[in-house]
Amino acid sequence: KLSKAHEAQLKLKNRRLYQQRLAVDAIALIVNNKNALDELSISELRNILLGETKNWNEIEPSKLKQIQVVFDHKHSSIVKYMVDSITGGKPFAGEVYAQQSTRDVIDKVSKNKNTIGLIGVSWITPDLRGRNKSAAEYYQELQKNDTTTLDFNDNIKVLKIRRDDYPIAFKPYQAYIFSGEYPLYRSIYVATTAARGSLPHGFLTFLTGYVGQKIIQNTGVLPAAIQPRMVQVN
């Protein structure tokens, strides 16, 4: 969402701003499958990012060594979110490393049992295994109302996260992101100053309409206008 300062600049230029909430993205924490840890609290995550918790055995009994944190790149929006929302404005400290891409983060975690990775939840899809869907498959998925199923890489697992004031931890399933029970989420907005009836404004209308929102839902990101539902799989 544009800041108040940006909105003021547009107003000075007599530009009318059209801005709408498009989706809700979540940040997933991934670890190597050889790591026995299944969940983290927000305060435990904060202590890791600030370098106050340095080793895995400080969280629970473990033979693993020093914690290494990896994220996609040095200008990452994930880092900005973590600093703004988790560390209280304090910069990362300790063994924290920027990679070149999210794919590099996934590869690093899959090969290093001491590493924890920060990635966008939209990366946790069947495409993680390199599976290419046909146009027909995508069309069939658009007709479904089911919450996107998380398909995890064999070498990594996604941690559950819990709030400090709540005893239950949650994975980043769409329903839990929607309810706010999964705490690591952020809103995505679409904005334009183009006039109504123009191509850019039409694209905004498409993105926030039913078809656009269904497409967003199938990327693994939670659309703003479509309420997810949980489906039990036995």
Please name every model-derived segment.
Residues 2:
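Glycine-rich phosphate-binding active-site loops on the catalytic face of alpha/beta enzymes
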Residues 8-25, 30-234:
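Exported/periplasmic ABC-transporter solute-binding proteins
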